[in-house]
Regions:
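A contiguous loop/helix-start segment that scaffolds small-molecule binding in enzyme catalytic cores
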Residues: 5, 158-261
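Class I S-adenosyl-L-methionine
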Residues: 1-110, 218, 257-260
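A polyampholytic, Gly/Pro-enriched intrinsically disordered region
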Residues: 74-80, 128-138, 157-159, 213-224
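Short, ordered loop/turn segments at secondary-structure junctions
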Residues: 37-38, 82-84, 142, 199-200, ...
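Class I SAM-dependent methyltransferase SAM-binding "motif I" and its flanking Rossmann-like core
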Residues: 20, 88-159
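Short gly/ser/thr-rich secondary-structure transition/capping motifs
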Residues: 12-17, 144-146, 209
Length: 261
């Protein structure tokens, strides 16, 4: 029997936001591999299956095991929160396979199952913050030097992109978002809207609406399951929502469906 490897995104954490395909392949799989927290997100879907849970920082071991299990004939789901192709395990899996001389057409079958990423789920909670161009950045410097991250932040700030920040801080990493805030204040008003979403669509979900000047007051809301969305020069708040206008107001009368001359 030939095995298969699914790299599965399970979304933000609630089954309502998991794709039909993700549920389908998890059900089809006889073996589940993943970071323990992510495995727990699908605990009720994997009863009776062979389960391999890993701690954080064991990504390489996790990747090799799921590849080996699939090569041995298992149907394996490697589960990730959000989308595995965005700061997820997909990149590492394909790097390892490429290094081994893998032939996608004739060797091990691999299917990437996309999921709802944090940028989608968090944006939906706070309104319409991503209507114009935006940049997605991770503050984690475990694999990318901080100097490179700073260059990317500055480029995004100069380009007036809305920013979506993943991995804003951890117990060992607290200065990165503070440094980012200082850099952004060179280009943006202190009143620029900021949203901090932690645990989107999980029972522990919290949402803080603040601004660039005061965002450092909410360090307790930051962590590895937090996402920070920072507006651009046109972003504004309306009640508990963040709105990033697409530009219709400059062309249309929003009270009447008529195109302006």
């Amino acid at each position: 029997m030939s095995g298969k490897l699914y790299i599965v995104g399970v979304g933000p954490g609630h089954h309502d936001h998991m794709t039909y395909r993700a549920k389908q392949v998890i059900e089809e799989s006889d073996t589940i591999v993943g970071y323990a927290t992510y495995v727990n997100l699908v605990e009720d879907l994997i009863q009776g299956k062979e389960i391999h849970s890993y701690a954080m920082t064991q990504e390489v071991e996790r990747a090799h095991q799921c590849i080996d299990l699939a090569k041995d004939g298992k149907i394996v789901s490697l589960v990730s929160s959000g989308d595995p192709g965005i700061y997820g395990m997909a990149g590492l899996i394909f790097e390892i396979l490429a290094e081994s001389g893998w032939d996608p057409k004739n060797d091990l079958q691999v299917e990437l199952v996309p999921g709802v990423s944090a940028l989608n789920s968090c944006a939906s909670i706070i309104g319409s913050p991503l209507m114009t161009d935006f940049a997605v950045l991770s503050m984690s410097d475990l694999l990318v030097p901080w100097e490179i991250i700073v260059k990317r932040v500055e480029a995004a700030a100069q380009g007036d992109f809305v920013l979506v920040i993943y991995n804003p801080s951890s117990k060992k990493r607290i200065h990165q978002l503070q440094d980012t805030r200082k850099l952004l204040l060179k280009y943006r008003k202190p009143s620029t809207p900021v949203a901090i979403i932690k645990g989107a669509f999980r029972d522990s979900q919290t949402v803080v609406m603040t601004d660039l000047e005061h965002m450092e007051n909410y360090a307790d809301k930051l962590g590895m399951i937090s996402t920070v969305i920072i507006g651009n020069s046109s972003t504004y708040n309306f009640k508990d929502l963040m709105i990033n206008p697409r530009g219709y107001k400059s062309k249309y009368n929003l009270d009447e469906p008529e195109i302006k001359n």
